[in-house]
């Protein structure tokens, strides 16, 4: 009472007047309610989910006390690994413990994508076991790291990449490498996935590399930073196919494609946004990294080439038989990292301390991005921890890089210095049965 009394005596007692008391009481009630409604409206409109986890019941209290990795492999299994506190353990490289496994993605999982505040996981099955169809499966990502199957639908053969797009991320676009197609899906209710569009592509004649370019081979489906366009690198057709997200519905409107060098085989795309927007394309057959400055119109997007080099930088040789694969831009947009497969030029100590045999490794190539020009400056080359780094990812803080090593059946975790952008030592790993195809963080 002392503190309250002192404040009342110093300010005067407003509650002696009934009208003033009513006004103050009303404000005490109305203001918190107004702020709560404003908070809910903001998140509902801008984040694509209802407050308090009311979207289909999949988002309720989705707050993770631990961090996980989801790993897909051609064994037909998606494995959850616990990565909590890896950087704090120090000392020897940590073996990541498996939390759970699921075979709900079918025989040959090729891609994983998180959605809806990381509460949903989509998995693509490439369909390599029967060679007829692929599939798209949805899972609820539980707080303990386990995955609960929600739905699975048959797709065109050979899906290898997917991204959420459109209003609240309620649509999914899928690139089908083996099926020469692009498909879109309504995932407003991830337990009832339904098709929107399927577009199949054809080639008039094989490309300069006929063994790999006998047909169109869309290898990725990437949403641009504005959320208005979808870019699809087609390895077989030497094109970046361009689509506008339809304002009137969930479909995509095809625009004119961006042609790349004949025989180069574009594989994956990454964007960097600072003062300008830059798009970087890694080509698998040409083993190049090509940069473009991006310009936007009302319903159009244009590209001006501003950079081209081999995957090891300007005037650097690429080993014969190499195959560039993944490209990722750091969360702060300052660095670009790419992986190259089948080089076999580096070595790392064996992760098993009882085994003295070194492990042959492919590289990760680290570039610094010039924010004004978009040019790339070679920053670092490091071993990635094994062979055939098909895919890798960076955590949200930019402190860890996780690499999926397809030929070694291994996932490795590397430290990364956010300030310098340098990749550091290995801090964790896990042996995973089958060819590892994809890995994603859930933090």
Model regions: which residues?
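Asp-box/WD-like beta-propeller blade repeats and closely related beta-sheet repeat scaffolds
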Residues: 146-220
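Short loop/turn segments immediately following beta-strands, especially the blade-tip
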Residues: 81-93, 138-145, 185-194, 243-251, ...
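Surface loop/turn motifs at the tips and blade-to-blade linkers of beta-strand repeat domains
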Residues: 101-105, 152-155, 211-213, 257-262, ...
């Amino acid at each position: 009472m002392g503190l309250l009394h002192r404040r009342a005596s110093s300010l005067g007692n407003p509650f002696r007047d009934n009208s003033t008391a009513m006004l103050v009481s009303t404000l005490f009630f109305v203001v918190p309610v107004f702020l709560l409604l404003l908070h809910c409206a903001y998140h509902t409109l801008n984040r694509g989910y209802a407050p308090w986890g009311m979207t289909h019941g999949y988002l309720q209290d989705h707050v993770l006390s631990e961090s996980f990795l989801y790993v897909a492999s051609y064994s037909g299994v998606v494995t959850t690994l616990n990565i909590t506190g890896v950087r704090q353990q120090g000392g020897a490289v940590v073996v990541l413990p498996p939390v759970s496994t699921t075979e709900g993605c079918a025989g040959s999982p090729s891609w994983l994508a998180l959605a809806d505040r990381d509460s949903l996981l989509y998995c693509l099955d490439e369909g390599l076991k029967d060679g007829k169809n692929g599939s798209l499966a949805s899972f609820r990502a539980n707080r303990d790291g386990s995955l609960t199957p929600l739905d699975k639908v048959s797709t065109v053969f050979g899906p290898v990449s997917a991204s959420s797009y459109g209003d609240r991320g309620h649509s999914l676009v899928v690139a089908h490498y083996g099926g020469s197609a692009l498909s879109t899906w309504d995932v407003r209710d991830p337990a009832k996935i339904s098709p929107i569009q399927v577009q199949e592509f054809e080639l008039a004649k094989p490309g300069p590399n006929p063994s790999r370019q006998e047909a169109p081979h869309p290898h990725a489906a990437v949403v641009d930073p504005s959320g208005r366009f979808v870019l699809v690198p087609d390895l077989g057709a030497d094109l970046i196919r361009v689509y506008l997200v339809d304002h009137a519905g969930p479909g995509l409107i095809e625009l004119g494609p961006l042609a790349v060098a004949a025989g180069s085989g574009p594989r994956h795309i990454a964007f960097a946004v600072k003062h300008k927007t830059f798009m970087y394309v890694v080509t698998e057959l040409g083993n190049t990294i090509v940069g473009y400055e991006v310009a936007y119109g009302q319903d159009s997007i244009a590209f001006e080439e501003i950079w081209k080099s081999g995957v090891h930088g300007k005037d650097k040789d690429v080993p014969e038989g190499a195959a560039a694969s993944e490209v990722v831009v750091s969360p702060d947009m300052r660095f670009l990292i790419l992986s190259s497969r089948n080089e076999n030029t580096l070595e790392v100590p064996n992760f098993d301390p009882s085994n003295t045999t070194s492990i042959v490794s492919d590289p990760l190539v680290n570039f610094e991005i010039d924010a004004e020009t978009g040019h790339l400056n070679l920053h670092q080359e490091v071993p990635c921890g094994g062979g055939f780094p098909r895919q890798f990812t960076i955590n949200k803080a930019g402190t860890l890089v996780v690499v999926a090593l397809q030929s070694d059946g291994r996932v490795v975790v590397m430290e990364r210095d956010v300030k310098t952008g340098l990749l550091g030592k290995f801090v964790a790993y896990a042996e995973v049965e089958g060819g590892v195809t994809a890995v994603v963080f859930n933090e």
